[in-house]
Amino acid sequence: MSLVNTSWLEENLDKVKIIDCSWHMPQTERNGFNEYKNKHIKNAIFFDLDKNSKKDTDLPHMLTDAKSWENIVSNMGIKNDDQIVIYDNSDVISSCRCWYNFIYFGHNPELVHVLDGGLKKWIEEDRATTSDIIKIIPSSYTV
């Protein structure tokens, strides 16, 4: 797994696709999407781990099929050659699950990174956050 540090991401904010994949255990009564809407790294897109997983199973967060993955990623505006940085704001390291999905479906591993320390470290270092939601222009991602 390729980690990037907060300094690197801050210098490259406009050169990479940033994904917030925060997910919390139900008993925490926290909601990753609501937290994303209130505070996230500039240009981040939210990845809903529940909605973007296989639906016809009792097991949580199983990989979806390739066609569904293409639709999910295309609707996030991500292209096959995009460099991606994934982070979370949770105690369950949900960013790693999102990373695994991209690797499993063939995104170049050299282009998929996880932010070391996640949003927690970003905030601790007093780096800028926003509540602005970016306008996504869909792409044509293929597996």
Q: How would you label these PLM feature ranges?
A:
Residues 35-38, 104:
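A general structural signal for stabilizing positions within well-ordered secondary structure
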Residues 26-29, 53-56, 92-96:
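Short active-site-adjacent helix-start/loop capping segments
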Residues 13, 41, 107-109:
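Short, well-ordered coil/turn elements that cap or connect secondary structure elements
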Residues 1-33, 120-143:
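Flexible, polar/low-complexity N-terminal or interdomain linker segments that lie immediately upstream
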Residues 22, 50, 90:
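Anionic group-transfer/hydrolysis microenvironments
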Residues 18, 44-46, 112-114:
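Conserved beta-strand scaffold positions in the cores of enzyme catalytic domains, especially
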Residues 60-143:
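Thiolate-centered catalytic microenvironments shared by cysteine-dependent enzyme domains
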Residues 38-41, 45-76:
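Aromatic- and Gly/Pro-rich amphipathic surface segment
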